[in-house]
Amino acid sequence: LFCPTICEDVAFGPRNMRLPETEVRSRVDKALETVGIGHLKNKSPFHLSIGQKKRAALATVLSMDAHILALDEPTSNLDPRGRRELIALLEAFPRTQIVATHDLDLVRHLCTRAVLLDAGRVVADTLPEALLDNHALLEAHGL
């Protein structure tokens, strides 16, 4: 988030795709409403909570109509309510998601496949339940 307002941040991608301004505005409004921060569109990102910033960042991706969503520790620094709300948003996202996380509960709720990496090497590639139920494997790799 680097623009003066959330609206401008969310519009950045579609504008750089050279979409018509009416389409840009439509995508921005839809993305902001989808993540529940339409009322913040004219606010500076520098004055938002962590949860609001995460929602704004997600809106920037949604406005691009991305087919794959890559997330790095999406629930970090969120309070319990913000975490639940973000997970609900991600569950509703109908596209492929690649999530890097240490939040094992997030894996259980959100993922259909789990890949465990250690020192850049794949040590497991399985269903989330199978991975999360293997306590010896998790402990051996620092989880």
Question: Model regions: which residues?
Answer:
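Conserved ABC ATPase "signature" region
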Residues: T22-L40
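Conserved beta-strand-loop-alpha-helix hinge in the C-terminal portion
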Residues: R121-G142
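A short, surface-exposed alpha-helical micro-motif characterized by mixed small hydrophobic
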Residues: V107-H109
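Catalytic Walker B motif of ABC-type/P-loop ATPase nucleotide-binding domains
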Residues: L69-D72
